[in-house]
UniProtKB/Swiss-Prot annotation:
Gene Ontology terms, MF aspect: adenylosuccinate synthase activity; GTP binding; magnesium ion binding
Keyword Ligase among UniProt keywords: yes
Cofactor(s) demanded: Mg(2+)
Protein's name in the database: Adenylosuccinate synthetase
Function: Plays an important role in the de novo pathway of purine nucleotide biosynthesis. Catalyzes the first committed step in the biosynthesis of AMP from IMP.
Organism of this sequence: Methylobacillus flagellatus (strain ATCC 51484 / DSM 6875 / VKM B-1610 / KT)
GO cellular component: cytoplasm
This protein's pathway: Purine metabolism; AMP biosynthesis via de novo pathway; AMP from IMP: step 1/2
Family: Belongs to the adenylosuccinate synthetase family.
Binding, Mg(2+): D14, G41
């Protein structure tokens, strides 16, 4: 009987999902993307020593680095065809077999040039204090078109005349916005049409009814791994709105973004760092100074190599926020937690955990809804002793320093979710397993 696992980021993204998805793929026959676009970034480190390889993935599911694992891009993903083909070419040059294992939903909305121009022009027009921190890759405008029912989808590419008609209508609208409101350059219709249609024969062999394919895989007893991108606190409905992404990043989207029923999802694994990070604008109650050497925030930033995979911007760093994690746990219905980057905290004498907030003089034990209230929250901390010993690469619970175990058990109690996995390094075997999501 199959068992299907959903992997979700529980913070503001960048929690280390890629390594965990890759590690879990040992027990899966399929890996599925269900939301976001190429604004997501996963870094996978495979092998050791001279044979070690590093793969940076944006659109292609992490399971592609595993031989024989099928990969699926569901209808909830917005697709930049140029980037997908670029990524496929790069992986094939690295010696991976991709095209006969990768399947794409015909319902994926297409990211086109006008989406990218709109994204960049809007961000440039915002006042400094109100910038979202968008990646400028056209994700948000594409989701807007989807909701407004004017998006062009992968399916449309295979009907050139209809595609041309739809493109003219939507491009007239967006060019008006670009030129009249944003003082940006218009997109040339013929150039956009030719460029988009040129991708049709390259994409067509990949296109499959993902809902049907996943149903049949599940029926055949295959284990499926649903790979979330970004994080719960960036969710368009449940995150620190408006400083969010434009898709739903929560476990429920695994069903909507692929066309499977919720009863096919058996276990939800929440990934969280042992501290907290955030890229771009928006409130961050437990944020620390990352510029002053010898400070905890500097150690998190420096030792944790906290640079965005996609944006190349320094990530903001702060103490672990249990009040925010409790919110994530409830929204996602988490079965278990995976704590990553524990080793980054090695050597910090005292570790603070944000257990709640004070908001307008009143105690609050959950992250509030909406960025304005979150920005006014003052963190309430509990302090635990740190540890001097290295935890890097440890793969057995009993080998962890006692204070590290105490820290993890306290996170477990505060978050009200069992810690099932602890990651102590970037490689597959640098992992402590207390309970395996696939029951292995």
């Amino acid at each position: 009987m199959s068992k299907n696992v959903v992997v979700i980021g529980t913070q503001w993204g960048d929690e280390g999902k890629g390594k965990i998805v890759d590690w879990l793929t040992d027990h899966a026959q399929g890996v599925v993307r269900f939301q976001g676009g190429h604004n997501a970034g996963h870094t996978l480190v495979i092998g050791q020593g001279a044979s070690q390889k590093e793969y940076k993935l944006n659109l292609v599911p992490s399971g592609i680095v595993r031989e024989g694992v099928n990969c699926y891009i569901g209808n909830g993903v917005v697709l930049d065809a140029n980037h997908l083909l670029f990524e496929i070419d790069g992986l094939e040059k690295a010696g991976l077999e991709v095209r006969n294992r990768l399947k794409v939903s015909p319902g994926c909305p297409l990211i086109l040039e006008y989406h990218v121009r709109l994204d960049k022009a809007r961000e440039a027009a915002r006042e400094p204090g109100r910038k979202i921190g968008t990646t400028g890759k056209g994700i948000g405008p594409t989701y807007e078109d989807k909701v407004a029912r004017r998006a062009l989808r992968v399916y449309d590419l295979f009907y050139p005349e209809r595609f041309a008609e739809k493109l003219r209508e939507v491009l007239d609208y967006h060019n008006f916005v670009l030129t009249k409101y944003l003082n940006a350059e218009a997109v040339d219709y013929q150039q956009q049409l030719d460029e988009a249609l040129s991708k049709a024969p390259l994409l067509q062999p990949l296109v499959t009814d993902i809902s049907a394919a996943l149903y049949e895989a599940n029926k055949a007893g295959q284990n499926l791994l649903f790979e979330g991108a970004q994080g719960t606190l960036l969710d368009v409905d449940h995150g620190t709105y408006p400083y969010v992404t434009s898709s739903n990043c929560i476990s429920g989207q695994a069903a909507a973004g692929t066309g499977v029923g919720p009863s096919m999802l058996h276990y939800v694994l929440g990934i969280t760092k042992a501290y907290t990070t955030r890229v771009g604008g928006g409130p961050f109650p437990s944020e620390l100074d990352i510029e002053t050497e010898d400070s905890p925030g500097f150690q998190m930033s420096d030792k944790g190599r906290e640079i965005g995979t996609v944006t190349k911007r320094k990530r903001r760093c702060g103490w672990f926020d249990a009040a925010a994690l409790r919110r994530s746990a409830r929204i996602n219905g988490l079965t278990g937690l995976c704590i990553t980057k524990l080793d980054v905290l090695d050597g910090i004498k005292e570790l603070n955990i944000c257990t709640g907030y004070e908001l307008d003089g009143k105690p609050v034990d959950l992250l509030p809804v909406g960025a304005d209230d979150v920005a006014r929250c003052q963190p309430v901390y509990e302090t635990l002793p740190g540890w001097d010993e290295s935890t890097f690469g440890i793969s057995r619970w009993e080998d962890l320093p006692q204070n590290a175990r105490n820290y993890l058990k306290r996170l477990e109690a505060l978050c009200e979710v069992p810690v099932d996995i602890v990651s102590t390094g970037p490689e597959r075997d640098e992992t402590i397993v207390l309970r395996h999501p696939f029951g292995a």
